[in-house]
Amino acid sequence: MIKAKKKIKKYKGIIFDLDGTLLDTIEDLTDSVNDVMQLYHFPQHDTKKCKMMVGNGFRKLITRALPEERQKDEQFVDEVLAQFAKAYHKRYLNKTVPYEGILQMVNELHKNGIQTAVNSNKRSDYTEALVNKFFAQTPMVAVYGERESKGIPKKPDPAAALEIADKMKLSSAEILYIGDSETDMKTGQNAGMDTIGVAWGFRGAEELKANHATYIAENPEDILKYIL
């Protein structure tokens, strides 16, 4: 009897974005932004608009949320950013949840020997706190948030992704980069990695297609089907 050949896994590691990919954080972010907008008597923003503001760190989020005539006042941005940090600290676990099917998907990846990591432009303390809260049972090779103060540039610079590849002891060709935005697709591409764009995230499939995602996943199960 001829035995069927065992499927060879091309990918042995995955790097995930956090907000809009693993976790739905938009309501807590929007509420925190609006707390600060209200404090300064500026117009409020809905979640749809906030989805287009996030992805490049808290400072960019706050700058984009401010009225245009105040966006270039760096000292004022610093002041508002400090207020946002206080508001988000109170709210960041209020409504944030993993997307449906995410926990099961990550667990299944680990059962199949796939290494995982998180690479986010979110502040490092919140990135680590959220991963510890929702993925405590899942070993991550690395959990990286924004580290510019340590000389590591933010996404889409590939520095953090390549650092994770070294930790995984894998080549870029063996790693998939998964996220929900142009920033994530460019990060993966800049690191020489194939990319999966998740259509359930903050930006949607059209932005992911326009930025040449290797594959578009409509749900977490699609990721498992693509990889395993």
Positions of PLM-derived features:
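Glycine-rich phosphate-binding loop signature in dinucleotide/nucleotide-binding domains
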Residues: 8-9, 112-114, 168-174
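Substrate-recognition "cap/lid" segment bordering the active-site pocket of phosphatases
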Residues: 94-95, 123-176, 182-191, 205-206
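Surface-exposed amphipathic alpha-helices with a cationic face
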Residues: 103-110, 185-190
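Substrate-recognition element of Asp-dependent hydrolases with the DxDx(T/V) motif
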Residues: 105-132
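Short, glycine/polar-rich helix-capping loops at beta-to-alpha or helix-loop-helix junctions
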Residues: 200-209
